[in-house]
Amino acid sequence: MEVKVENVGKSQELKVKVKNFIKRSDCKKKLFALILGLVSFELTMNIMLSVMYVESNEALSLCRIQGTPAPRDNKTNTENTKKETTFHTTTTTRDPEVRETKTTKPKTNEGATSPSRNLTTKGDIHQTTRATTEAELEKQSKQTIEPDTSTKKHTPTRPSSESPTTTQATAQLTTPTAPKASIAPKNRQATTKKTETGTTTTSRAKKTNNPTETATTTLKATTETGKGKEGPTQHTIKEQPETTAGETTTPQSRRTTSRPAPTTKTEEEAETTKTRTTKSTQTSTGPPGPTRSTPSKTATENNKRTTTIKRPNTANTDSRQQTRTTAEQDRQIQTKAKPTTNGAHAQTTTTPEHNTDTTNSTKESSKEDKTTRDPSSKTPTDQEDASKGTTAANPRKNTEANTRTPPTTTPTRHTTESATSTTGDKTKAKTTRWKSTADRQPIRNSTTAETKTAQSKQPTPKQLSNNTTPENTTPPNNKSSSQTDAAPTEEIEIRSSLWRRRYVYGPCRENVLEHPMNPCFKDNTTWIYSDNGRNLPAGYYDSKTDKIICYGIYRGNSYCYGRIECTCKNGTGLLSYCCNSYNWS
């Protein structure tokens, strides 16, 4: 208690002292001044801090805008670059399946194809190898029948636009000739360079003989095409054309999968051989793209059809086919096609030789096969040339191939397999791709007669493939228009297979001249292109000028029937030629 009392007393004393001190006038003034000073200082500091805060925020925001985004962009660019680099390096093809197939199985077809493609084009050798690897991998994985694995060596090399298709064709060609099939891919590779064209043609015949295998091949080719438009993608296309073209030469693996009766083989082989002969003749011809026009009319139709199947897969497929055909081959095809515009007769003559030479005609076939492969070759000029070459070859097939062709022109790429088996022609397979699987296959079977009747119309299919240069396109267009006019009823019957859906690549603002099949050519009719399920307006029909006005960049299938031509400074030709890089198929 005492302590507390003392403490209380001390505190009271302190309070009293403070009160007394405050009461003094001096102290009051000083305290007042101090308080004012503190308040003013606080206010000024608050103001300064707020100003500084605003300014600092602005500065920070500027720094963030300028500095931060740049690093992010750089990182993104770097990452993208790495990704892109990895993607291109690792994957030649766009489709995942194709990639897997490449890694898993680069085999016989690739080996055989690589040499042949190398023969076709120096630039294509590497591409051919890669494309071959992809195509073969897909074929092997899908078909479950693996061609000889010895061919893998070529696969690691560049994926040539021609090579993938060539590889498949080579393996297939080898198969039709039992000894060839027995021969290891190594032999094929060695032989293919010399006889790549023949082998390719044979393989196409083989593919045709085996509808199931052909379908598988076509799908694979399509997958590859999707991945690398110009390089590996085109490879796939080549495979498809080969598969379609080579009914007789169904590869061993394809034979195992599904092989038509030997009789069909012989017929398809004959057709394939015809194609080869025409192609070889064309090979001698010089101009790659433009020269096609004359052969294109009859032969180009088949080729275009083939191109149609391949291109739909990715424009790349077509390029590969084109690359396959050297300018010379394409020219030869054109040359043959011109004499053989009706082509069926000339082709028929050639057919016996090729059929007989299935084993020995590997070299000849290789040249012609180059032409056949050309449709799937990837070089733009070669692509068109190749399509022409194929068409030229097809003119021989025109009687048989034309029957097959109507399905071929219209077919959806997916349907290419069935079309290929039925037709045994590249054109058939191509047609199938364009058509829906259900429609295309029935059309092929039902349109065999129609196709023959439509042969006169085939100039339109030729135009569809736009693998011909504008020059070449014009003669085919004239034929097709005359044919179309001559047999409108047949065209209407056949159009589902032959005329449905034109395929155009890239922007073309040229006027497109159409030789119509009925429902599409009316005023204000809109032409539609289907691109991966998307419907894009491609143009409209003007009855005053009798032209289809093209809107521009569209890629896909046209829902309208008829072949489309465009008027260019270079003259009348297919849309692709008018645009320099865009094709109808």
Curated annotation (Swiss-Prot):
One of its GO terms (cellular component) is host cell surface. The chain crosses the membrane at residues 32-54. Residues 72-86, 94-103, 226-241, 265-274, 364-376 have a biased composition (Basic and acidic residues). It is found in: Virion membrane; Host cell surface. Residues 55-299 are virion surface. Its main location: virion. Glycans are attached at residues 74, 118, 360, 445, 466, 478, 524, 570. GO terms for biological process: symbiont entry into host cell; virion attachment to host cell. Residues 157-179, 197-225, 248-264, 278-298, 340-362, 400-423, 465-484 have a biased composition (Low complexity). Keywords: Glycoprotein, Host-virus interaction, Membrane, Transmembrane, Transmembrane helix, Viral attachment to host cell, Virion, Virus entry into host cell. Residues 110-132, 299-326, 443-464 have a biased composition (Polar residues). Residues 1-31 are intravirion. Residues 67-491 are annotated as: Disordered. Attaches the virion to the host cell membrane initiating the infection. Unlike the other paramyxovirus attachment proteins, lacks both neuraminidase and hemagglutinating activities. Belongs to the metapneumoviruses glycoprotein G family. Homooligomer. Interacts (via N-terminus) with protein M. Interacts with protein F; this interaction occurs on the surface of infected cells. Interacts with protein SH. This is Major surface glycoprotein G. It comes from Avian metapneumovirus (isolate Canada goose/Minnesota/15a/2001) (AMPV). The gene is G.
